[in-house]
Curated annotation (Swiss-Prot):
Motif (YLRT): 27-30
Protein name, UniProt field: Methanogen homoaconitase small subunit
The keyword Amino-acid biosynthesis is annotated on this UniProt entry: no
Pathway, per record: Organic acid metabolism; 2-oxosuberate biosynthesis
Subunit structure comment from the entry: Heterotetramer of 2 HacA and 2 HacB proteins.
Function: Component of a hydro-lyase with broad substrate specificity for cis-unsaturated tricarboxylic acids. Catalyzes both the reversible dehydration of (R)-homocitrate ((R)-2-hydroxybutane-1,2,4-tricarboxylate) to produce cis-homoaconitate ((Z)-but-1-ene-1,2,4-tricarboxylate), and its hydration to homoisocitrate ((1R,2S)-1-hydroxybutane-1,2,4-tricarboxylate). Is also able to hydrate the analogous longer chain substrates cis-homo(2)-aconitate, cis-homo(3)-aconitate. These reactions are part of the biosynthesis pathway of coenzyme B.
Species name: Methanosarcina mazei (strain ATCC BAA-159 / DSM 3647 / Goe1 / Go1 / JCM 11833 / OCM 88) (Methanosarcina frisia)
Length: 169
């Protein structure tokens, strides 16, 4: 289930962070989420998984999640404890894969430094950065917010199906 607003410490990355950096290909044969978590961002910061704490937030530049369409990339970040990703832009398939697994994200161009505390309000489409102000982002459409609130696509479809069963009974 999604919390809102999402508050956390920033991990800052640049432009064109591809899925090979997020979770290197040599780990894709496993289905163990702890393996994914242990190797998240290994291609750019080998110690990331040991330093990241549950509730941390990634802030990045343009085209976050580009490259191959591996769904393991957002899974690795989610299981490493990342609560949200804010980027200037996302690769479309990464964006949808993140929504599908219930990993909140927002497109926004914000000013912050690694280690800053930020607050991401998905319902308002804004990010507050301690000591630096409030930045407007792209508010997600309601149907995507509903999916995130329910924990992702599968959980959302189950909820809708259960509601439909109740209504028809």
């Amino acid at each position: 289930m999604m919390e809102n607003p999402i508050k956390g410490r920033v991990w800052k990355f640049g432009n064109d962070i591809d899925t090979d950096v997020i979770i290197p290909g040599k780990y894709l044969r496993t289905k163990d989420m702890q393996v994914f978590a242990a190797h998240a961002m290994e291609g750019i910061d080998p110690g990331f998984s040991k330093k990241a704490k549950p509730g941390d937030i990634i802030v990045a530049g343009d085209n976050f999640g580009c490259g191959s369409s591996r769904e393991q990339a957002p899974l690795a970040l989610k299981h490493a404890g990342i609560a949200c990703i804010v980027a200037k832009s996302f690769a479309r398939i990464f964006f949808r894969n993140a929504i599908n697994i219930g990993l909140p994200l927002m497109e926004a161009d914000i000013e912050c430094e690694e280690g800053d505390q930020i607050e991401v309000d998905l319902l308002k489409g804004e990010v507050k950065v301690s000591g630096k102000g409030v930045f407007r982002g792209n508010k997600l459409p309601d149907f995507l917010l509903d999916m995130l609130t329910d924990g992702g696509l599968v959980a959302h479809r189950k909820k809708v199906r259960d509601q439909e069963k109740e209504e028809s009974a």
